[in-house]
């Protein structure tokens, strides 16, 4: 009677396309599909041969980092897609990994959302925990240090970096004071200023590699690439392992497992090119310095290095000249250091200004 009543009300066996049917767990649908294919496979050779593909049609999901799949051959809609194809073959769930380069697609997905260098037009920023960017942050903060209101010597600054930051994960004022007293540099009553409490910057990745990957022959470039991979693919451990196996075949399974336990997130505000390739002559000697050289050899922070005393800003302006896009397009807004919501507001404002100029002639 119950079944007849449900049939009369058109409520018996609701269609899968009905949103109300979504309350049934996905696993139950999959179980039913497998049972149906199992029964049909005993009667039909075609079903039996294609059962796995049918299941894949049901279970397959395009990874979020691959995004919209553009048609083979390209077209106008390609600008909204970042998926990288290995070939122009027709795409199916069962040949997805052979047609789509998931690693490169994931890299593009992250990179298209990251900001560009604050000073150099179009240059990608470094990961926040990059070895180079971490060193920059430490030196930029350390160069503000004052003892009894006076700047410390460059030699002492370098010693603090090597003896404290390179040997201690977190450098506090207490540790700094103890170090200075132990080295005979100052007394207990010394007034430490120029920093806001404890040091905020640290060499996190440097210590991670030193502690967790002992005995592994990795160059500075290799370590930077590993850090970049963790930032790009850290949310997908399987993809990260796959990437590391391909790029570093000399690493053992245990070493790769150790790497996947590391966690680095976020991006800095500066590019490698800005820190290492923008150069200017040293004021006193005329020696060619990069930003990193100047931070190490002086007690000036970045803002001081970009002042008129040094010539770094001239090099920055020379680099940017001719590279900036003077046309009004959303792509030019994309490269600004602003959140997506702010970028939209800037773009809308520019469109209003453009319309006013058109109306005013």
Protein language model regions, located:
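Extended, Lys/Arg-rich, non-catalytic nucleic-acid recognition/anchoring regions
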Residues: 1-350, 354
């Amino acid at each position: 009677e119950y079944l007849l009543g449900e049939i009369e009300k058109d409520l018996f066996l609701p269609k899968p396309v009905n949103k109300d049917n979504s309350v049934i767990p996905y696993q139950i649908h999959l179980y039913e599909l497998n049972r149906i294919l199992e029964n049909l496979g005993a009667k039909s050779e075609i079903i039996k041969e294609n059962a796995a593909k049918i299941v894949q049609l049901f279970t397959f999901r395009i990874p979020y980092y691959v995004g919209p799949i553009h048609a083979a051959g390209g077209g106008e809609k390609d600008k909204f897609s970042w998926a990288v194809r290995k070939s122009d073959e027709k795409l199916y769930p069962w040949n997805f990994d052979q047609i789509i380069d998931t690693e490169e697609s994931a890299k593009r997905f992250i990179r298209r959302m990251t900001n560009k260098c604050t000073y150099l037009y179009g240059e990608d920023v470094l990961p926040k925990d990059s070895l180079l960017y971490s060193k920059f942050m430490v030196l930029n903060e350390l160069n503000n240090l004052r003892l009894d209101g006076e700047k410390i010597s460059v030699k002492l600054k370098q010693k603090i970096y090597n003896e404290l930051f390179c040997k201690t994960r977190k450098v506090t004022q207490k540790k700094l004071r103890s170090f200075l007293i132990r080295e005979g540099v100052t007394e207990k009553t010394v007034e430490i200023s120029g920093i806001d409490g404890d040091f905020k910057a640290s060499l996190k990745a440097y210590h991670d590699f030193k502690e967790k990957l002992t005995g592994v022959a990795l160059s500075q470039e290799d370590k930077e690439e590993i850090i970049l991979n963790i930032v790009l693919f850290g949310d997908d451990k399987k993809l990260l392992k796959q990437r590391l196996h391909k790029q570093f075949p000399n690493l053992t399974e245990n070493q790769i497992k150790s790497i996947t336990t590391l966690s680095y997130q976020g991006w800095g505000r500066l590019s490698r090119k800005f820190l290492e390739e923008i150069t200017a002559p040293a004021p006193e000697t005329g020696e060619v310095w990069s930003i990193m050289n100047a931070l190490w050899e002086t007690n000036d922070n970045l803002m001081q290095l970009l002042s008129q005393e040094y010539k770094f800003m001239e090099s920055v302006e020379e680099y940017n000249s001719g590279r900036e896009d003077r046309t009004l397009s959303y792509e030019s807004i994309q490269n600004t250091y602003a959140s997506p919501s702010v970028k939209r507001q800037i773009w809308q404002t520019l469109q209003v200004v453009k319309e006013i100029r058109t109306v005013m002639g």
